[in-house]
């Protein structure tokens, strides 16, 4: 409750004049203690204004109005990405650490979680640098992963991702294999494999 004594700027407003009040709040956690997720969360605001109208012509009277607003809370949609030689569904080959002129393969794994709202038409995209080769192996094969060689772009068409994915049910995951052929200029460096 804001009263005129606490907000002198709103104590008296001339016709057409505006005032402003700011406040902060925190929402409840979207994940409950039992690990269930609050789906399609919203915050409903009802703001009630009350004041006295003072006019030389019309005298005084009470003016009241209410405004109701709803704020929809976005989903937390996160991607975790790893590149590994030893872990994942593929057997990798090549020297470790990598050596100039010899290809070393890695498994790139992506994992998606989604908190509180269903997401439609989700897509994850990444680019392979010129020194990284797409090998064409994807697991599971049912996931829609494609590679555009002209752009060096890997694309994962997830489509619909339900609320709670990765929190109340298993994360959505996919892995693909790449080959890295280091050059002399990369000796002693840690080259980026996927961006």
Model-based region annotation:
Residues 1-195:
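Exported/extracytosolic protein signature
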């Amino acid at each position: 409750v804001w009263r005129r004594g606490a907000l002198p700027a709103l104590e008296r407003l001339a016709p057409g004049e505006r005032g402003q009040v700011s406040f902060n709040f925190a929402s409840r956690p979207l994940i409950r203690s039992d690990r269930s997720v609050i789906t399609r969360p919203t915050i409903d605001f009802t703001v009630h204004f009350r004041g006295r109208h003072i006019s030389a012509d019309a005298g005084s009277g009470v003016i009241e109005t209410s405004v109701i607003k709803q704020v929809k809370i976005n989903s937390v949609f996160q991607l975790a990405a790893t590149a590994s030689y030893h872990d994942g569904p593929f057997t990798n080959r090549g020297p470790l650490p990598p050596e100039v002129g010899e290809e070393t393969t890695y498994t790139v794994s992506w994992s998606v979680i989604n908190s509180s709202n269903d997401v439609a038409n989700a897509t994850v995209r990444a680019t392979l640098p010129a020194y990284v080769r797409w090998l064409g192996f994807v697991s599971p094969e049912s996931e829609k992963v494609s590679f555009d060689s002209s752009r060096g772009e890997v694309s994962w068409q997830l489509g619909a991702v339900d609320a709670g994915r990765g929190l109340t049910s298993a994360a959505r995951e996919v892995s693909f294999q790449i080959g890295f052929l280091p050059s002399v200029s990369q000796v002693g460096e840690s080259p980026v494999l996927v961006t």
